[in-house]
């Protein structure tokens, strides 16, 4: 980057003053905020769950409150917990001034229940779907998927975590006390003005990248926990930024789950990637340490911060995701890390079809075509397996609704251990091969979508439509 003479003089003057008058961005790095834990909503006894989409007030910087969008009166929504074999009635109420559609990424549902064009909720209206929960335990997320407006709607705050539990997860010796040793950790990046108001000006040829890392809506959060294992349910709800997470002292994460459920066994990983839309569950051993810090790469240096005064920066002011502080003595009864979690015995029948998917780089579209709500791009059959080969010259995440898949290879090489397990979102940097199971039916007027998970690219047309013919037709 080059500076004009005037900018150079300004930067030089500011640099001389750093020691005497620290910049706000510099001072804020060391301020810690208790991690906000979203309220927990559970389906019990057939009672409906109410989700009101409305304006709210929130502080992103700990100083100024600003108007945001939210769910049930706060930025981001409550965490919803449901159980396998529940039939969950939702009541979405739109109290905003524009149409919104909502979906739950990770829930295995028919196309009639996945939001989108046909399920837009007009201002002042409700949508009351009944969702049959028939899948194994998983960490999912619900969010706006409004046609051509998904990126700004998610950025403004229409998102939350959705947990599915089953008998297996209930009986495993894993941390499961919500907000005590089992935490939702929702990562986003924003750009805030001097009054803590989010700015949203995405580049015309890519997705929005901010310079301020937020976790559950705040900067530099911490939690206090008892000694023992803790569980973090990680969700990347950013529009376009991918994170590389690690623990500051070099210890490993013990990864136990990915997008669509638990892994057969815990996997120790030193560094964890998290693309937009991806979820991962990890355990961290806090039995012997007083403090552990989870980070997302390098923080901005002084010069990067100074540059950010003159032009938008994409370097994170602070890379701290979460500081974990252990208190008290180790309990006399502690659970060891289980060596086995679940049996993955899904039978794979023969693959009936191979498909090639090409994601355009800086121009929107899939296989050279922009999204058209009146066009079906792929027709498949429920209960069958397909091999999808997804290509991207510019790295980006890719998501498919209504299916579950496993990553078979990435650029001809076996997947990394952190990419084991059933998924619905994958990072594509070159060429990936996916084994896709067509789990749910969809229809011409209620198709599944597959799209670039860079939300601005999806809004511009990097979306295709999938009809999965029901098994009895």
From Swiss-Prot:
<keyword id="KW-0132">Cell division</keyword>
<dbReference type="GO" id="GO:0016491">
    <property type="term" value="F:oxidoreductase activity"/>
</dbReference>
<dbReference type="InterPro" id="IPR006311">
    <property type="entry name" value="TAT_signal"/>
</dbReference>
<dbReference type="GO" id="GO:0043093">
    <property type="term" value="P:FtsZ-dependent cytokinesis"/>
</dbReference>
<keyword id="KW-0574">Periplasm</keyword>
<dbReference type="InterPro" id="IPR045087">
    <property type="entry name" value="Cu-oxidase_fam"/>
</dbReference>
<protein>
    <recommendedName>
        <fullName>Cell division protein FtsP</fullName>
    </recommendedName>
</protein>
<dbReference type="Pfam" id="PF07732">
    <property type="entry name" value="Cu-oxidase_3"/>
</dbReference>
<dbReference type="InterPro" id="IPR008972">
    <property type="entry name" value="Cupredoxin"/>
</dbReference>
<comment type="function">
    <text>Cell division protein that is required for growth during stress conditions. May be involved in protecting or stabilizing the divisomal assembly under conditions of stress.</text>
</comment>
<dbReference type="GO" id="GO:0032153">
    <property type="term" value="C:cell division site"/>
</dbReference>
<dbReference type="GO" id="GO:0005507">
    <property type="term" value="F:copper ion binding"/>
</dbReference>
<feature type="signal peptide" description="Tat-type signal">
    <location>
        <begin position="1"/>
        <end position="27"/>
    </location>
</feature>
<keyword id="KW-0732">Signal</keyword>
<dbReference type="InterPro" id="IPR026589">
    <property type="entry name" value="FtsP"/>
</dbReference>
<dbReference type="Pfam" id="PF07731">
    <property type="entry name" value="Cu-oxidase_2"/>
</dbReference>
<dbReference type="InterPro" id="IPR011707">
    <property type="entry name" value="Cu-oxidase-like_N"/>
</dbReference>
<dbReference type="GO" id="GO:0030288">
    <property type="term" value="C:outer membrane-bounded periplasmic space"/>
</dbReference>
<keyword id="KW-0131">Cell cycle</keyword>
<comment type="similarity">
    <text>Belongs to the FtsP family.</text>
</comment>
<dbReference type="InterPro" id="IPR011706">
    <property type="entry name" value="Cu-oxidase_C"/>
</dbReference>
């Amino acid at each position: 980057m080059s500076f004009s003479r005037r900018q150079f003089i300004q930067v030089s003057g500011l640099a001389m003053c750093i020691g005497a008058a620290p910049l706000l961005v510099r001072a804020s790095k060391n301020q810690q905020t208790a991690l906000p834990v979203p309220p927990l909503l559970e389906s019990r006894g057939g009672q409906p769950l109410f989700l009101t989409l409305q304006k709210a007030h929130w502080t992103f910087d700990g100083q100024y409150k600003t108007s945001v969008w939210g769910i049930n009166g706060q930025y981001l929504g409550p965490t919803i917990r449901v159980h396998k074999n529940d039939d969950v009635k939702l009541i979405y109420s739109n109290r905003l001034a524009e149409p919104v559609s909502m979906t739950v990424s990770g829930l295995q549902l028919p196309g009639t229940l996945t939001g989108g064009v046909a399920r837009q909720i007009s201002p002042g209206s409700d949508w009351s779907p009944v969702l049959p929960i028939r899948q194994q335990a998983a960490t999912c997320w619900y969010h706006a998927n409004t046609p051509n407006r998904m990126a700004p709607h998610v950025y403004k705050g229409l998102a939350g975590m959705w947990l599915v539990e089953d008998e297996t997860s209930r009986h495993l010796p894993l941390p499961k006390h919500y907000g005590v040793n089992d935490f939702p950790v929702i990562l986003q990046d924003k750009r805030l003005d001097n009054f803590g108001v989010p700015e949203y000006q995405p580049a015309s040829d890519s997705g929005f990248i901010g310079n301020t890392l937020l976790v559950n809506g705040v900067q530099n959060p911490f939690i206090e926990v008892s000694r023992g294992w803790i569980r973090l349910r990680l969700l990347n709800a950013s529009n376009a930024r991918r994170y590389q997470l690690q623990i500051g002292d070099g210890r490993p994460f013990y990864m136990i789950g990915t997008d669509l459920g638990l892994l057969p066994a815990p996997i120790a990983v030193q560094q964890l990637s998290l693309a937009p839309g991806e979820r991962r569950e990890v355990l961290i051993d806090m039995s012997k340490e007083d403090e552990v810090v989870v980070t997302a790469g390098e923080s901005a240096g002084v010069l990067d911060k100074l540059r950010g005064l003159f032009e938008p920066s994409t370097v994170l002011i602070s890379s701290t995701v979460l500081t974990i502080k252990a208190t008290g003595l180790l309990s006399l009864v502690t659970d060891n890390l289980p060596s086995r979690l679940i049996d993955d015995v899904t039978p794979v029948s023969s693959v009936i079809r191979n498909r090639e998917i090409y994601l355009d780089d800086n121009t929107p579209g899939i296989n050279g075509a922009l999204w058209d709500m009146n066009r079906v791009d792929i027709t498949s059959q429920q209960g069958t397996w397909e091999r999808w080969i997804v290509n991207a010259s510019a790295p980006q995440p890719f998501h498919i609704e209504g299916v579950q898949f496993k990553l078979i290879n990435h650029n001809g090489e076996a997947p990394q251990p952190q990419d084991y397990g059933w998924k619905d979102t994958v990072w594509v940097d070159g060429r990936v091969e996916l084994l896709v199971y067509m789990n749910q039916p969809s229809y011409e007027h209620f198709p599944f979508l597959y799209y670039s998970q860079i939300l601005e690219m999806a809004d511009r047309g990097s979306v295709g439509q999938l009809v999965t013919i029901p098994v009895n037709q």
